[in-house]
Amino acid sequence: KRDFIDSRANLTQLLMEECLSGFPKLPKDTFVIWTGIKNNAETVENLYKGGKTPHCSSAYDFRSWLAGHLGLTNGGMEINAACASSTVGVALATQFIAEGKYDHILVAGADTVSRFVYYGFAALKAMTEKACMPFDINRNGLSLGDGAVALFLSVKRNTDIRVAGCGVTNDANHITGPSRDGAGLAQAMRQAIEMAGLGTDAVQGFCAHGTGTRYNDTMEILAARSVFGDLQPPMFGLKGAIGHTLGAAGGIEVALSGKCLAQEIIPPTVGCKSPESPEIVLEKMPFPGKNILTSNLGFGGVNAAVLMEKLS
């Protein structure tokens, strides 16, 4: 059992090391926001049974390890906003930099599939026995995935892609279920668009949470219609390709949306064959647009959105 728990911690660290392999050396005063949320579940179970704590088990442990691994000395914090954690982390990092609290922030997190997480979603009847089919009329649940993300935000311009706007809300609808009308998510989306200084008609792409569950995807479509009206931008989801990576999901989608802007393409919504709404992207398409809105939801009614913008 101890070896199993340590192996999960090691897998999280390996994911982060691979994720950071292409990073340049970061300034020592970089503040770290850790957004991995589920890596200590087996540790809690083991302690309950009288077992020992592995060398790295809590969010604090992983954040401290990451800072030490990178030689960073400016401290940090951990966020748990469920599956919107890294999206909220990006929003908070953007706010901190705008307020002059920090010049450089690393938003990072990794989550791996565990027995605890698998059983939890299975108990909610949210898992699919087949492939994940985001926004498909025949969808029947989500698929879990391992994933890691590291996003470096700086007061200095290091790239042509920037965070232009963020929004975070909580509709307090239910401990696990999304609000059926999408009002809280729509509010977060509008906040991000307004912060970017844009009108809703200026949003050119939308990367949605798209878990593949019945209620989530319908609610997201309702939220998008509420925000965009008849001027729906191309809407796509990534979880049919990579699975639901929990606390890392939003950050991965922010990063890949930045890649979409840089490479001028939008990927297909893998797994979707019969879309519930016509704006869902089914095939890879050219995308000369200058911005993409991303959004994520988490248990407890959390809604978060980030608007990514290409400057040139």
Question: How would you name each of these model-derived features?
Answer:
Residues 1-18, 35, 87-158, 249-312:
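Conserved beta-strand-centric core segments of catalytic alpha/beta enzyme folds
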Residues 1-36, 40-41, 188-200, 227:
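Conserved active-site "lid/cap" helical segment
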Residues 16, 66-67, 152, 189, ...:
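Structural element of the ATP-grasp superfamily
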Residues 36-39, 110-113, 148, 165-172, ...:
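Glycine-rich beta-alpha junction loops
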Residues 127, 131-196, 204-205:
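Condensing-enzyme catalytic core mediating Claisen C-C bond formation in acyl metabolism
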